[in-house]
UniProtKB/Swiss-Prot annotation:
Quaternary structure note: Part of the 30S ribosomal subunit. Forms a tight heterodimer with protein bS6.
Xref: NCBIfam families: S18
Function field: Binds as a heterodimer with protein bS6 to the central domain of the 16S rRNA, where it helps stabilize the platform of the 30S subunit.
Gene3D superfamilies named among the record's database cross-references: Ribosomal protein S18 (4.10.640.10)
Cellular compartments per GO CC: cytosolic small ribosomal subunit
Disulfide bond annotation, renumbered to this chain: none
Claim: RNA-binding is one of the keywords in the record: yes
Family, per entry: Belongs to the bacterial ribosomal protein bS18 family.
Transmembrane residue ranges: none
InterPro entries noted in UniProt: Ribosomal_bS18 (IPR001648), Ribosomal_bS18_CS (IPR018275), Ribosomal_bS18_sf (IPR036870)
Protein name: Small ribosomal subunit protein bS18
Species for this entry: Hamiltonella defensa subsp. Acyrthosiphon pisum (strain 5AT)
Keywords, sorted A to Z: Ribonucleoprotein, Ribosomal protein, RNA-binding, rRNA-binding
Amino acid sequence: MARYFRRRKFCRFTAEGVKQIDYKDIIMLKNYITESGKIVPSRITGTCSKYQRQLAQAIKVARYLSLLPYTDEHVRRESCTTEVP
């Protein structure tokens, strides 16, 4: 049986020597947000804790300034209750 080989995750920001994550870099921030608008955890992306905190703060600031949406789905959901005749 062959073993599954998983690539080692690494922090992209440490490798590139980034000092501070900029909230205005929307293209980069979109890579760390799911389709539903949630912030992707560091165990998935491989980002170290220092930059994960900066990343979360930058995403929250960008959302507050309307540079990023809070959610991609702006569909109004039907209520769970049914009407009684």
